[in-house]
Amino acid sequence: MKVGIIGSGGREHSICLSMKKSSKVDKIYCFPGNAGTSEIAENISIDLENHQNIKDFILDKKIDLVIIGPEKPLVEGLVDYLEKFKIKTFGPNKIASKLEGSKIFTKKLCQKYNIPTARFGIFKNKRDAKEYLNNSNFPIVIKADNLASGKGVYICENKKNGYIAIDEIFNGKFGEAKNILIEEFLNGEEMSFFTIHDGKIFKNFGTAQDHKRVLEGDRGKNTGGMGAYSPSRLINDELKKKIIEKIIKPTLQGLKDHGSEYKGFLYTGLMIVKNEPYLIEYNVRMGDPECQ
């Protein structure tokens, strides 16, 4: 069996290592890959935005399964494109990828399907967003709607920091911003909950605790992840059941109502408050560093 792995991070190196251990896998391609993957797979230099070139290479090499690591190709619809050519691909389609591609899409899904999450407001311009801050309690959380490589979330301790966050997002720090999300700060402890889906059923894939702040003592701006450990010490049978029944299953139903069945890894970012789970965000792929 030939496997193609798309991406260039530590996450993709970890997936390559796991594939290498399988007796069913004869050959691994990683595009574009990195120095680590070059030791266990054949790195292929392909522009990930050129879907046609990716498709041509996969068909030419008769690759049996493609695993997409990062979020950007998923949000851009690479799965949908490859599946048109009957290429077996592991990852969510474009509709399902909106769970990560648009934080506002996910918040509206939470609202409609009664998924526990922080209270929030959606704003289309700086003036309205800043006016909202003038009457808010701090700390407060401000988020860019679109993809931001894990850096589009601001935890603002005061109005000045909130104004800076609003200006940066609307001024295009993370690309064109038509909307901004402001939500209440939940005072709890974060936990990552992983599931793996085939479009029909899903299995729990473990938990982790990710540390995102760039400085020691949980200070500084968010990153994609400075480090992680697994399993999370917060998980227990009661909490696991609540996460599945209150968050995962209603989300899958919401996607089904949008005409999409989820396939791939689903990374559920949670805040745990007194053993109650609240959805912070979804990632439609494995985390990095959590996957490692």
Residue ranges and their predicted role:
Residues 1-94:
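ATP-binding N-terminal substructure of ATP-dependent carboxylate-amine bond-forming enzymes
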Residues 5, 30-31, 67-68, 89-92, ...:
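General beta-strand structural signal in soluble alpha/beta enzymes
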Residues 90-152:
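A conserved helix-loop-beta module that forms one wall/lid of the active-site cleft
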Residues 58-63, 135-136, 175-176:
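Glycine-rich phosphate-binding loop signature in dinucleotide/nucleotide-binding domains
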Residues 152-291:
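Internal nucleotide-binding/catalytic subdomain
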Residues 38-41, 53, 98-104, 215-217:
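Short, charged, surface-exposed secondary-structure boundary motifs
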Residues 43-49, 121-125, 156:
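Short acidic-hydrophobic, aromatic-tinged amphipathic segments that line or gate anion-handling sites
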